[in-house]
From Swiss-Prot:
Keywords from the UniProt entry: Methyltransferase, S-adenosyl-L-methionine, Transferase, tRNA processing
Residues at the active site: D163
The protein's Enzyme Commission number: 2.1.1.33
Protein name listed in UniProt: tRNA (guanine-N(7)-)-methyltransferase
Taxonomic lineage of the native organism: Bacteria, Pseudomonadati, Pseudomonadota, Betaproteobacteria, Burkholderiales
Length: 256
């Protein structure tokens, strides 16, 4: 078997509606008391799904997706090779993940997304573009990082354009809170990186504060970084920049 040829993932397609449990509790913990708040990587939203996306979910989950399980994932087994693993949280419709994975065939990309339309779109991209170095987990990202990613194991993490929750009363729902950043940092190997991007300025300010306050991380720039060549500019981003909107990249490295 060629080192770049993936080993098919055994098992049936994962449940399409992900479970959500207490975000930073151990997997075998008892449920929190009613009314307690938890960091979650998503909220349930009803959305349109195309027939092509539906077909991909039905036909390709067993080939390219990894079922959530409350135990550490073995990337070499999942991808069929030993290679640096990059975690992509919230890949949306998969346009950026597809381009990055094709441009960096030497790396493995583990994409985490909860919404059916996005997962179906990414599965279709993997199959039609023949991208052997991408796997998908359809589940809450916080639980995946907590339960399935071993400490000091990731070469990098990408969090591009997470939900900004623009209303002030909803800021507590934003993904990049200190507890989750601390968890992410613990899963990145020394020398690895955490790359975030947002087009909401006040979220960029919060990201800079939260990432800068994490003891395991150090900023690679004085504040915000230039967009690196490996992160492609999306159509939405291009349109926003043309209209005068800003985009902020933050790249932090895990300290040795």
């Amino acid at each position: 078997m060629n080192a770049n040829t993936p080993t098919p993932i055994d098992g049936q397609p994962t449940e399409l509606t992900p479970s959500t449990q207490a975000a930073l509790e151990p997997a075998n913990h008892a449920p929190a008391s009613p009314g307690a708040t938890h960091i979650r990587s998503f909220v349930h939203r009803r959305g349109h799904i195309t027939q092509r996306q539906r077909d991909a979910l039905e036909q390709l989950m067993g080939k390219w997706a990894i079922p959530y399980a409350p135990r550490p994932l073995n990337p070499a087994t999942a991808f069929g090779r030993e290679a640096p693993t990059i975690l992509e949280i919230g890949f949306g419709m998969g346009e950026t993940t597809e381009k990055i994975a094709l441009a960096r065939p030497e790396d493995n990309f583990l994409g985490v997304e909860v919404f059916n339309a996005g997962v179906g779109s990414m599965l279709h991209r993997i199959e039609t573009s023949q991208i052997p170095n991408v796997r998908i987990i359809q589940h809450d990202a916080v639980e995946v990082v907590r339960d399935m990613i071993a400490p000091d194991s990731l070469a990098g993490v990408h969090v591009y354009f997470p939900d900004p929750w623009p209303k002030k009363r909803h800021h507590k729902r934003r993904l990049l809170q200190p507890a989750f950043v601390q968890l992410l940092a613990s899963r990145i190997k020394p020398g690895g990186y955490l790359h975030c991007a947002t087009d909401w300025q006040d979220y960029a300010v919060q990201m800079l504060e939260v990432l800068g306050g994490e003891a395991l991380l150090e900023n690679t720039a004085q504040d915000y970084a230039e967009r690196p060549a490996y992160r492609p500019q999306t159509k939405f981003e291009t349109r926003g920049l043309r209209l005068g909107h800003g985009v902020w990249d933050l790249i932090f490295k895990r300290k040795a």
